């Protein structure tokens, strides 16, 4: 029995005031990913997988928010299908629970897989860490990643809106509430 949970955080093309330009759609541009071992509580295999957007361009607003530039994507980006294959090869996620902080990551992954007609590399078993945190702490309202860390007396490690760093910090929260 595998004791790992895959934790992801996606960064996607975005625009100021959520105004999507005509003819463009939100595309995943980074898959931040790591593994949490439920038994040992160790977090490992943290990485960023940069993805070439197929239906949109990276806006200046998106670069300012995420630090992801068109140049970075040109140098390190791979096609979404290749990113999914890399995840399958390195994490073997099809039988593991996967998690993210909120519903966006699950929904965007499913939408992009559906659009491209490829199989989602992850299992059907998804944990919404934001909901788990709220329920674990008996909170009425949801809170963001930074506030959840603060509530646990933990500092954010890395850069906010870096997929790998956000996934790692989400895994730290999950580790505390499991």
Features from the language model and the residues they span:
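Metal-dependent phosphoesterase core characteristic of DEDDh/y 3'-5' exonuclease domains
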Residues: 2-3, 24-31, 35-68, 89-178
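Short glycine-aspartate micro-motif
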Residues: 5-7
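Short acidic, Gly/Ser-rich segments with clustered Asp/Glu that frequently serve as metal-coordination loops
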Residues: 10-20
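A generic structural signal for short coil/turn motifs at secondary-structure boundaries
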Residues: 17-19, 74, 135, 158
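Metal-dependent phosphoesterase signature
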Residues: 63-86
């Amino acid at each position: 029995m595998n004791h790992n949970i895959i934790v992801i955080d996606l960064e996607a093309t975005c625009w100021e005031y959520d105004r999507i330009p005509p003819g463009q759609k939100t595309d995943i541009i980074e898959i931040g990913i790591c593994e949490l071992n439920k038994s040992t509580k160790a977090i490992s295999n943290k990485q960023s997988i940069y993805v070439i957007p197929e239906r949109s361009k990276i806006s200046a607003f998106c670069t300012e928010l995420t630090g992801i530039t068109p140049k970075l994507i040109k140098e390190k980006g791979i096609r979404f299908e290749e990113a999914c294959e890399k995840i399958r090869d390195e994490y073997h996620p099809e039988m593991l629970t996967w998690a993210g902080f909120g519903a966006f990551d699950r929904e965007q992954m499913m939408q992009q897989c559906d659009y491209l007609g490829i199989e989602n590399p992850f299992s059907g078993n998804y944990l919404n860490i934001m909901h788990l945190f709220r329920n674990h702490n008996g909170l009425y309202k949801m809170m963001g990643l930074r506030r959840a860390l603060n509530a646990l007396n933990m500092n954010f490690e890395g850069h906010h809106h870096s997929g790998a760093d956000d996934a790692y910090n989400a895994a730290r929260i999950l580790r505390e509430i499991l």
